[in-house]
């Protein structure tokens, strides 16, 4: 595996390649990331991964400086997995050599709801860096995880509207044996919090069961699920059932027509904020 730190080095290694598959990450890799890279290898060759902690997507009170930088360990994991040909690990000056005054702004009806409501500017930062990375790598395929469901939708829509020649492929959420979605932030959980953490996924499973059984008062079942988590010590930001196609609130006619739905949640357990989702 080649490790490169500049855009020019990256392009030199990829010259003449037209089936590149790409997985962007912020590092601190776990089995979920490695699963994305394995899927990327099925869709193209060579596989490029990136590790870049993107300041633009962190709010003023978020954990940019605290976010784990584990490049040496990440390189060892990637070399052991043997799925990645080039790792692109730029520093901030390489990605942002001047102030990033031009940015991608997702539409309000998608970028300012759910995660966007609680993390203003987050999806603008994500969209901007993904567009820059796609410009650097120029892949045929890019792989994203469904754990970040709203992010996946925004990236797909951005690529479609800008007519970028890249297919966005989604990987199912990778979970621990007890159902907890794998996340770099899980390392912040205390042992007691780690034991409690699967309750978030269980709340989503309960919503799925109730909708499958015919529940139609979605605000009521969302409220009950959030209250149940709060009673266990969670601080719930949102727990919502939305349409898969646009993440808008389902209307009665959507429920009657069998519109595909997804339940999404974000909640804090202690100081750690976890997100998850489940297609219904």
Swiss-Prot record:
Main subcellular localisation: cytoplasm
Residue ranges of coiled coil: none
Binding-site residues for (R)-pantoate, renumbered to this chain: 57, 151
Gene3D superfamilies named among the record's database cross-references: HUPs (3.40.50.620), Pantoate-beta-alanine ligase, C-terminal domain (3.30.1300.10)
Top EC class for this record: ligase
Active site per UniProt: 33 (proton donor)
Keyword ATP-binding applies: yes
A Pfam cross-reference name: Pantoate_ligase
Annotated positions binding beta-alanine: 57
Residue positions binding ATP: 26-33, 145-148, 174, 182-185
Keyword Nucleotide-binding: yes
Entry keyword set: ATP-binding, Cytoplasm, Ligase, Nucleotide-binding, Pantothenate biosynthesis
Molecular functions (GO terms): ATP binding; pantoate-beta-alanine ligase activity
Catalytic function, reaction form: (R)-pantoate + beta-alanine + ATP = (R)-pantothenate + AMP + diphosphate + H(+)
GO BP: any one term: pantothenate biosynthetic process
Cell compartment(s), UniProt: Cytoplasm
Pathway(s) per entry: Cofactor biosynthesis; (R)-pantothenate biosynthesis; (R)-pantothenate from (R)-pantoate and beta-alanine: step 1/1
GO CC, alphabetical: cytosol
EC numbers: 6.3.2.1
InterPro entries with a match to the protein in the record: Cyt_trans-like, Pantoate_ligase, Pantoate_ligase_C, Rossmann-like_a/b/a_fold
Functional summary from the UniProt entry: Catalyzes the condensation of pantoate with beta-alanine in an ATP-dependent reaction via a pantoyl-adenylate intermediate.
Subunit structure: Homodimer.
Misc. comment: The reaction proceeds by a bi uni uni bi ping pong mechanism.
HAMAP family in alphabetical order: PanC
Family: Belongs to the pantothenate synthetase family.
Identification of the protein by name: Pantothenate synthetase
Organism annotation: Bordetella petrii (strain ATCC BAA-461 / DSM 12804 / CCUG 43448)
